């Protein structure tokens, strides 16, 4: 017997101020449960309890746990992608080292603003809809970087799109290693400067 996958889209889009506040409360509660109890124990019951509402109220906005987690992850990724896009636009026509500093600063300003949240959401990204969301946002970021790189006066890239893929990897790889504790947090004060230099040196060739 063929089964139908449960929907991952929200039941309704919050329009009224009260609805927006409710969704924000659910997102905050979800992050808190993820951080304190882990992904496996992040249930709709626990999230609703943490948010101070009934499970029935939660289901008015999200039909199931997967949809809730997907919504939280999508918001997180959208904020980062939007910030990187704004940074790219702000440095178009600038030298590549200036571009590198702006891209790294924009990415880290959100990723490191709440390290526990960022780390917890890596686990959510491995869930059912995470790969799709990551793919959509990844493509946006790569395109934004590529469109910016071609405006650099010291642009020497034979393939700006491939360079953009590599540049994004230079940013995201060390950042994840830092958030997951592989890079000791003793280096917090130096991390952004070193990452900016690493990316700048790569782009400068």
Regions found by a protein language model. Give the residues of each.
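Helix-turn-helix
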Residues: 25, 29, 33-67
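Amphipathic alpha-helical packing segments from all-alpha helical-bundle domains
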Residues: 75-84, 98-101, 105, 109-116, ...
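Short linear capping/connector segments at secondary-structure termini
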Residues: 86-89, 120-128
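N-terminal intrinsically disordered/low-complexity leader segments
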Residues: 1-21
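Hydrophobic/aromatic-rich alpha-helical bundle segments in the mid-to-C-terminal region
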Residues: 2, 118-123, 131, 150-198
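Short amphipathic alpha-helical elements of helix-turn-helix/winged-helix folds
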Residues: 29-33, 110, 170
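Short, structured helix-loop boundary elements
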Residues: 23, 44, 66, 70, ...
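Generic hydrophobic, amphipathic alpha-helix propensity
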Residues: 19-30, 47, 72-84
């Amino acid at each position: 017997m063929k089964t139908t996958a449960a929907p991952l889209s929200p039941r309704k889009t919050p329009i009224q101020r009260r609805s927006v506040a409710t969704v924000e409360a659910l997102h905050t509660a979800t992050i808190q449960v993820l951080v304190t109890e882990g992904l496996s124990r992040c249930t709709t019951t626990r999230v609703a309890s943490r948010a101070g509402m009934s499970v029935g109220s939660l289901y008015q906005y999200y039909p199931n746990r997967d949809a809730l987690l997907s919504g939280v992850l999508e918001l997180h990724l959208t904020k980062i992608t939007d910030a990187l896009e704004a940074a790219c636009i702000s440095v178009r026509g600038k030298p590549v080292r200036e571009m590198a500093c702006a891209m790294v600063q924009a990415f880290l300003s959100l990723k490191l603003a709440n390290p526990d949240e960022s780390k917890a959401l890596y686990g959510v990204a491995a869930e059912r809809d995470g790969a799709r969301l990551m793919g959509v946002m990844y493509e946006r970021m790569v395109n934004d970087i590529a469109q910016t790189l071609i405006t650099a006066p010291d642009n020497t890239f034979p393939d700006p799109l491939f360079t953009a893929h590599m540049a994004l990897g230079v940013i995201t790889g060390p950042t994840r290693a830092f958030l997951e504790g592989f890079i000791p947090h003793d280096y917090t004060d130096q991390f952004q400067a070193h990452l900016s230099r690493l990316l700048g040196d790569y782009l400068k060739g």
